[in-house]
Amino acid sequence: MRGALLVLALLVTQALGVKMAETCPIFYDVFFAVANGNELLLDLSLTKVNATEPERTAMKKIQDCYVENGLISRVLDGLVMTTISSSKDCMGEAVQNTVEDLKLNTLGR
């Protein structure tokens, strides 16, 4: 289920035309904070992105699921995230998007 949410988040990001170079660090920061189980760390991450109260509530519920499922669940999700992020397809897409962003930024000046 969470893997499907990751794919959906990445698709929405691309559909909205948001630059991957800007969103990836934010995504991984929030994901780490959620999976870590530390509520203060999650609050700090969500403050950086100006999360609304409903978004904060939803993320805290997801974090509660991680805490309830224990360390093994967190480690397994971390492995899945690493596997997806370091796959050939994902890396190729990231490089392609970065090159396109650099071209657009250079042409825009």
Swiss-Prot record:
The long form is preferentially expressed in the salivary gland, while the short form is preferentially expressed in the skin. GO terms for cellular component: extracellular space. It holds the Pfam family Feld-I_B. Glycans are attached at residue 50. It is found in: Secreted. Residues 1-17 form the signal peptide. Keywords: Allergen, Disulfide bond, Glycoprotein, Secreted, Signal. Heterotetramer composed of two non-covalently linked disulfide-linked heterodimer of chains 1 and 2. Belongs to the secretoglobin family. This is Major allergen I polypeptide chain 2. It comes from Felis catus (Cat).
